[in-house]
Amino acid sequence: NGHEVGAFEATGHKILPVAVGGDGKITPDMLNPVVEQHRDPHLTKPGLVYISNATENGTVYTKAELTALYQRCQELGLLLFVDGARLGAALTSDANDLTLPEFAHLCDAFYIGGTKNGTMFGEALVINRPELTDGFFRMKKRMGAVMEKGWIQGVMFQALFTDDLYFQMARHANEMAARLQDGLKAKGWTLWVESPTNQVFATVPNDVKPQIDAVCDYEDWCPYDESHTVIRFVTCFQTSQEDVDGLLAALPDLH
């Protein structure tokens, strides 16, 4: 919610944060306390669990993890929505053991990310429960999410799902991230998390950051401690081996 300037809550829905570990995943046991804490009728009643695959920390839900989470959601009367902005990266990761059809049956709704894997704009929402589609178009229209030339988005996804292009591009991004991670470790950098997808997180000394600023752009992810910061690099389908190797050559050695 922090990166979306309160967009979810602006629609009238309340976000109930769940504290997760370093892998960025929500587990079944994390849900029960939230539900129990909100049984008071004066508090917001939980209705849906929102997760991302790949997660914000670049990790991937396994088939067993997603199955267990979905089962718990059903037991608690909660819907499960999966943010698939990086779904291509997740499903082509070496850490993944799910096919797209298997994944699709382990949640109530999800979207197939396009913006982060080749399209100029847009995502493709998949709703698995027919009762959730009632009035959905009107809802989109009311929120200003119906495009005049929406067919253009369909054309882009048609191209992405021809000849496995969507997954080829995501797989390439993952491979370039792995190359970058290996190169950073060889230069003495410390990884904050071993990400199997196209996000790379490194913990760097704050006094070294000016040297990094001089050679590339990156994102400050979070403070690590008083003298270190976690920074993020992201690769994509356009990232080449030459791009990665050139960046590694320019970055400081931290041995």
Whereabouts are the PLM-identified features?
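PLP-dependent aminotransferase-like
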Residues: 1-45
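Active-site phosphate-binding strand-loop segment of PLP-dependent enzymes
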Residues: 26-84
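Active-site-proximal loop/turn and secondary-structure-junction residues that shape catalytic pockets
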Residues: 55, 86-88, 116, 239
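Active-site pre-lysine segment of PLP-dependent enzymes
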Residues: 63-71, 75, 86-109
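Conserved C-terminal alpha-helix-loop-beta "cap" of PLP-dependent enzymes
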Residues: 178-253
